[in-house]
């Protein structure tokens, strides 16, 4: 296939990936979408008819020559950190092995550039499973010889949907004193940042949204929108609570452990976008939340 500066989008059926796909399509960029099943095809066909079906977490053989004819790979591929999104795959399988398989195929096929959406906290010293999987892939990407940009978003607004779901159940947990600050970002705004680095950009950038709030302020916004009671949970109790699921469900433990970390430490990145958390909350359809 002749190289026509085609871009591969991995993780193309998630909220971030779909917006990346949409923006690239609007720019007239030829795009290939990687999806995992035929059932997902209708999500991406409004933006491209170049669709590959494969599960990168199964290794290179399942996606062999996926990147043939590709100039740039954009990967928004990763496991959901939501407590209400169970998945059989581990963070190691989804965030590391799947991206590594795509990277190996990209190197083999002479891809020029790789843009990867990681997470803020990937470089923390403590051995969080979620952060570790991203960090392992970041290291692989750095050593690959490809041009790259690694984006570390501080968090998505949609990542706080768990609190909205709990608010429907009349409780909004806040770990610690709630004074840790963050400037989480809307997935549409983050997609625009990702696409802006499509052809070139910094090696690593930490990306946030337009406004900085404390965790308590965000909980109060959720309460104003949905109702519920804000309940402060001491950090020590949260750590004990996160450890208990490890006996039964390693993935749930990983999510709770990392949630406690990010909500008790400042998670602030370079300001981008225009959509506020209050605006995001106003668009939530509570009937669609479990």
Please report, for each region that a protein language model flagged, where it lies by residue.
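NAD(P)H-binding glycine-rich loop region in Rossmannoid oxidoreductase-like domains
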Residues: 8, 38-101, 105-108, 123
């Amino acid at each position: 296939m002749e190289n026509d500066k085609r871009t591969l989008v991995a993780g193309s059926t998630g909220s971030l990936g779909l917006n990346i796909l949409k923006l690239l399509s609007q720019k007239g960029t030829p795009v290939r979408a990687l999806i995992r099943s035929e059932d997902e095809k209708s999500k991406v066909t409004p933006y491209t008819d170049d669709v590959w079906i494969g599960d990168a977490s199964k290794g290179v053989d399942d996606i062999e020559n996926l990147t043939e004819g590709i100039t740039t790979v954009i990967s928004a591929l990763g496991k959901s950190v939501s407590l209400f999104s169970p998945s059989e795959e581990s963070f190691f399988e989804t965030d590391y092995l799947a991206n590594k398989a795509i990277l190996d195929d990209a190197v083999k096929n002479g891809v020029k550039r790789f843009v990867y959406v990681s997470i803020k906290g990937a470089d923390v010293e403590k051995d969080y499973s979620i952060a570790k999987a991203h960090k392992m892939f970041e290291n692989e990407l750095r050593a690959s010889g490809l041009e790259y940009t690694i984006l570390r978003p501080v968090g998505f607004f949609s990542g706080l949907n768990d609190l909205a779901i709990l608010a429907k159940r009349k409780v909004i947990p806040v770990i610690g004193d709630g004074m840790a600050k963050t400037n989480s970002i809307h997935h549409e705004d983050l997609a625009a940042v990702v696409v802006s680095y499509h052809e070139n950009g910094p090696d690593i950038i930490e990306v946030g949204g337009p406004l900085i709030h404390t965790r308590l302020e965000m909980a109060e916004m959720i309460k104003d929108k949905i109702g519920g009671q804000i309940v402060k949970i001491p950090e020590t109790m949260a750590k004990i609570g996160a450890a208990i699921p490890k006996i039964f469900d390693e993935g749930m433990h990983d999510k709770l452990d990392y949630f406690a970390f990010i909500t008790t430490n400042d998670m602030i990145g370079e300001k981008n976008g225009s959509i506020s958390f209050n605006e995001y909350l106003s668009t939530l359809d509570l009937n669609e939340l479990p």
